[in-house]
């Protein structure tokens, strides 16, 4: 069972990682191509392109300027410990045991605008380059054009290494668009999380992001290996709804918080 998640805008490079064990991203040569494009952008260009404040634009211009593929554990951090958004609150990587971290390294993959596809222990430098960014590059008008079939093929290789065909898509639409579902060799399962609000069940972004992270952690903790086992997910008040589910979209509901 392979799990796909999105990265996070919020980063933590202050706290030391819980382990020195690390790996290097598979697509650093591609990352360097993108960095070279980004290094030609002014802070004003970045502010417009990424729709961010001047301060954040300046910070990212500096990050692009300082980026080097020859980084190490001394100045970088493993992705699973560096990302600190809602999804990663749900994953709660700081409480993983060494055995759980090993399973996470095997089963979890993080889609990234800059790095392509990351394993949890892959070292990254601070960056911000969302997959939906319309960054013109030698391969096209945006990052979807840049990555092309590369990430789909990488996911297929990871699925083959797992030994089963299940792909659990817990990534956002923005990031999963970088993968071509029809070319995947595995069975794609996309869980849906809905909370009760104003008289109906609906997807609420903040809660859904955290739920995706909690499900990723649940799969690791419980060593889930089938869709039926996945349906038993009951963390933080969520429960499986047979009525609202579709064959490859199991739906989980939660009452008003």
From Swiss-Prot:
One Pfam family this sequence matches: H2O2_YaaD
Any one biological process term the GO annotation gives: response to hydroperoxide
GO cellular component assignments: cytosol
Database matches in InterPro entries: YaaA
Signal peptide: none
NCBIfam families: PRK02101.1-1 (NF002541), PRK02101.1-3 (NF002542)
PANTHER family per the UniProt record, alphabetical: PEROXIDE STRESS RESISTANCE PROTEIN YAAA (PTHR30283:SF4), PEROXIDE STRESS RESPONSE PROTEIN YAAA (PTHR30283)
Similarity comment text for this entry: Belongs to the UPF0246 family.
Name of protein: UPF0246 protein Shewmr4_2963
Species of provenance: Shewanella sp. (strain MR-4)
């Amino acid at each position: 069972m392979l799990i796909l998640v999105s990265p996070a805008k919020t980063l933590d490079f202050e706290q030391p990682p819980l382990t020195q064990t690390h790996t290097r991203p598979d697509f650093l040569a591609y990352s360097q191509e993108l960095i070279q494009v980004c290094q030609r952008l002014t802070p004003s260009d970045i502010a417009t392109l990424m729709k961010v404040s001047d301060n954040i634009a300046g910070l990212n211009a500096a990050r692009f300027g300082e980026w080097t593929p020859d980084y190490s554990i001394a100045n970088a951090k493993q992705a699973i410990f560096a990302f600190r958004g809602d999804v990663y609150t749900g994953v709660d990587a700081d409480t993983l045991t060494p055995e759980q971290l090993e399973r996470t390294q095997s089963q979890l993959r993080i889609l990234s605008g800059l790095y392509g596809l990351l394993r949890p222990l892959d070292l990254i430098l601070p960056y911000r380059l969302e997959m939906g960014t319309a960054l013109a590059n030698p391969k096209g008008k945006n990052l979807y054009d840049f990555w092309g079939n590369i990430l789909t093929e990488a996911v297929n290789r990871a699925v083959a290494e797992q030994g089963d065909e299940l792909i659990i898509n817990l990534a956002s639409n923005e990031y999963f668009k970088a993968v071509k579902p029809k070319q995947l060799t595995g069975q794609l399962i996309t869980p849906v999380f809905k909370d009760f609000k104003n008289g109906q069940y609906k997807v609420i972004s903040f809660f859904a992001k955290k739920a995706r992270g909690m499900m990723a952690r649940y799969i690791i903790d419980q060593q889930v290996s089938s869709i039926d086992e996945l349906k038993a997910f009951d963390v933080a008040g969520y429960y499986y709804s047979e009525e609202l589910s579709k064959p490859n979209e199991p739906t989980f509901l939660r009452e008003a918080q």
